[in-house]
């Protein structure tokens, strides 16, 4: 099944279901605060595992107690697609287990 870019309305509707996520130009993004650098690093590893499973990868940034990610779909020219929201939902599901807020 081909991946298609989402419309602005579709993006806004999906973002409404993912508090903390926002549209940043041509990508969706979110930052998480964690209790320690080690916890943040562990979350990055967990996100990387999910990305490999989905075969869909974000830009991840690890800071002192913060993990930030931005995601869009390169295969459709860098637009936001359902794949990006699938990854965002998976990250939202794993974040509480790392103590992320």
Swiss-Prot record:
It is an enzyme of class 4 (lyase). The keyword Lyase applies. InterPro entries: PCD_sf, Pterin_deHydtase. One of its GO terms (biological process) is tetrahydrobiopterin biosynthetic process. Transmembrane segments: none annotated. Pfam families: Pterin_4a. Keywords: Lyase. GO terms for molecular function: 4-alpha-hydroxytetrahydrobiopterin dehydratase activity. Its EC number is 4.2.1.96. It catalyses: (4aS,6R)-4a-hydroxy-L-erythro-5,6,7,8-tetrahydrobiopterin = (6R)-L-erythro-6,7-dihydrobiopterin + H2O. Belongs to the pterin-4-alpha-carbinolamine dehydratase family. This is Putative pterin-4-alpha-carbinolamine dehydratase. The lineage of its organism: Bacteria, Bacillati, Actinomycetota, Actinomycetes, Kitasatosporales.
């Amino acid at each position: 099944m081909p991946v298609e870019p989402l419309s602005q309305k579709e993006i806004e509707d999906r973002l409404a279901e993912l508090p903390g996520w926002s549209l940043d130009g041509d990508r969706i993004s979110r930052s998480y605060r964690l209790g320690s650098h080690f916890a943040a690093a562990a979350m990055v590893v967990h996100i990387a595992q999910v990305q490999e499973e989905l075969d869909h990868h974000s830009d991840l940034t690890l800071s002192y107690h913060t993990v930030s990610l931005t995601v869009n779909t390169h295969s459709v020219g860098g637009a936001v697609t359902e794949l990006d929201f699938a990854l965002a939902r998976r990250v939202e599901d794993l974040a509480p287990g790392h103590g992320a807020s």
